Amino acid sequence: MSEEPTPVSGNDKQLLNKAWEITQKKTFTAWCNSHLRKLGSSIEQIDTDFTDGIKLAQLLEVISNDPVFKVNKTPKLRIHNIQNVGLCLKHIESHGVKLVGIGAEELVDKNLKMTLGMIWTIILRFAIQDISIEELSAKEALLLWCQRKTEGYDRVKVGNFHTSFQDGLAFCALIHKHRPDLINFDSLNKDDKAGNLQLAFDIAEKELDIPKMLDVSDMLDVVRPDERSVMTYVAQYYHHFSASRKAETAGKQVGKVLDTFMLLEQTKSDYLKRANELVQWINDKQASLESRDFGDSIESVQSFMNAHKEYKKTEKPPKGQEVSELEAIYNSLQTKLRLIKREPFVAPAGLTPNEIDSTWSALEKAEQEHAEALRIELKRQKKIAVLLQKYNRILKKLENWATTKSVYLGSNETGDSITAVQAKLKNLEAFDGECQSLEGQSNSDLLSILAQLTELNYNGVPELTERKDTFFAQQWTGVKSSAETYKNTLLAELERLQKIEDSLVEFAKRAAQLNVWIEAADDHVFDPINVDSVQGVQEIQEKFDAFLHDQSQQFAELEALAALTQQLRELGRSENDYSVISYDELSAKWNNLLAGIEERKVQLANELTTQTNNDVLCQSFSVKANEISDYVRVTLDAISQNTSSDPQEQLNNIRAIITAHAEKKPELDELYTIASQLEEAQVVDNKHTQHSLESIKLKWDKLNTLAKKNEQVVEGEILAKQLTGVTAEELSEFKACFSHFDKDNDNKLNRLEFSSCLKSIGDELTEEQLNQVISKIDTDGNGTISFEEFIDYMVSSRKGTDSVESTKAAFKVMAEDKDFITEAQIRAAISDSKQIDYLLASMPAVEGGFDYNSFAEKLYQ
């Protein structure tokens, strides 16, 4: 579309204004030189340096990329100059610009007003029209661009191209918006207009390569700065930052690709770190569980049991959760790699989920064996404690007996009558019988206990043996020696003694023996029942039955003593000085023993019932736990095999698994009920299974967690495929721009409005490209673009493609079409410092910069 003709009549107030004329001359001269310098040329006086047409032709060739033909390079005469300038004016008109009132003669005659009018027309066509289609639309689009970029800046409100820029803040805001590293806007003195203008002009010239087309005086020494000069200068900002935006867009595309690969690499690194730490913990814990050094006391073993219980309650569950989370991370990583068509992640040996599960199973086996070893050791220590108590009780009783007898035997009293001497001899005979009975029974019991302690690997057996042997060798032998001495003394005095009351002696002897048996029998009747199985109860029952058989034989001895007592009473001897116990006392002990026997029978029956019931519960727990464990294992296999290439099919499969898992919950509740019954029964070990409630619950939760995380990953991947790649901020920007150019609010843009809208947001299309876009998105063919069609175009044009070609293309834009990219270009296009560091560390260095092509190839291998 052609430019509107530029009036050059004397009514043009802007050209008549001398100050504006001076400003335009300066600005237009700088603009021309910004292009002529590409050819190594320049002008100094805009009204004289174009009079021969040579530099004017150079300017037109640079800005239009189209040569001006047949220009006389060595004009000699005025007619030659007019011909050259005429060719230039025709060249301008050939690009769709109508020149009204501007002739070659006026330019050759150095008419400043005509020259400035011509240059303004050129600026409109080649510098500002590419922002829109015609002057009004171009001005509006450029103004909208300034307003959007300076929105939110303190005391900056752009409403025109003259007074709105007079304080310099708008220029500073435009620079800060795009290059915040160049200006600290908050530190500016908002009232220092000259300082702000000078700062903006200097930075634009030095850092942005925008020539200084205006001076501070051009903006401040007039009430209203020249609009054309300001527009020309602002257009330089637009074109500079538009080029930067392309590089930034390419940088964002590269950034998205890098985010994906960096996240995958970080996920791999995190998995390996956590997996290594977990496997190390499992190995260390398994080594400690394989130790069997539990100490040599019940308290020590119970301390180990408490520590093991606390470990299973507090230390192990988080590690079990870590197993589940690592498997979820591993499967999620594989799913993401598969969905983006990358090679699967291969973990080092020993760190795959299956290998970790195997290591975990070995740990649980070690736990089971550790718990069993503790149970056996506690049982052993309890047996040792009972045997030691019994051993000490027997030996203490012997020591007390020996001490008592030593006092008696050491008196050496013979009595004052034959009866008394005979009584002492009889008493000594009773002592001898009791001594032999005690020695035989006690020594047998002590040896039996020592044998049992030896079998239990009790390390104190030598000390106990030495104590026993020392007692019998010293104190016991001393008592026997004293008895023998005392007996000889009595016999020496007994020549006149006669046998007195053999029956009393017989009673004393037999009663003492029976009394010893009754006291020894207490151990079979009153010892506590300490078992944890049906077999244990049966073993005690067998020993008890053997004892009952012996008891029936001892009962015959009691009846014989009863008959002997009756005979003594009939003879008038109710007292028996030779006996240590009376029949009534012996009978009372016997009756007490009988009561204990009956109670023992009840205890054994109850214990058998209890252990039988506990065993039934253990078997029920084992069956249910095995069922749930098998179900979890099969379901986990199903999840790991859910590898369909269709994400929706994967999602349907995993959701079906989650639903079925929820329906299985009552079976877990049933297991909890059985476990509660076992806990109430104080059953801590189950020989029918190695599963515990905690291990089943851990497997159950692991399945639940893995399924849900798998669901989340697949849902996320489906959603990722549906995303457009356009941010909410960009969508809001598209809507605001569309509404601005939709003047009649009919939710449609005509061709001119659509083109202006695209250019206001930085999309510059040629006429051919614009025609192709409209024919593609105007689906109803009505010649207008609806908001929905506009958004579809913006989304499709900004949706990144994840391929090696698209990534290379993005890098090429950032590198300004070179085959290598510099660090400065990377930092100019990408703002994320982590992404910048990653690129600088990963890209191969080449002469002049970095090889982005080989880097992109490596990314997609």
UniProtKB/Swiss-Prot annotation:
Residues 22-127, 136-242 form the Calponin-homology (CH) domain. GO terms for molecular function: actin filament binding; calcium ion binding; protein-macromolecule adaptor activity; structural constituent of cytoskeleton. Changing E789A: Decreases sensitivity to inhibition by calcium. Disruption phenotype: Cells show a minor impairment of growth under conditions of reduced temperature and hyperosmotic stress. Fruiting body development and spore production on soil plates is strongly impaired in mutants lacking abpA, but is only mildly affected in mutants on agar plates. Double mutants lacking both abpA and abpC show a marked reduction in growth, cell size and resistance to osmotic shock, and decreased motility and phagocytosis rates. Development is blocked at the tip stage of aggregation, although expression of developmentally regulated genes does not appear to be affected. Changing D746A: Abolishes cross-linking activity and reduces calcium binding by 55%. F-actin cross-linking protein which is thought to anchor actin to a variety of intracellular structures. This is a bundling protein. Increases the actin-stimulated ATPase activity of myosin. Involved in vegetative cell growth, phagocytosis, motility and development, probably through stabilization of the actin network in the cortical cytoskeleton. PANTHER family: SPECTRIN/FILAMIN RELATED CYTOSKELETAL PROTEIN. Belongs to the alpha-actinin family. This is Alpha-actinin A. It comes from Dictyostelium discoideum. The gene is abpA.
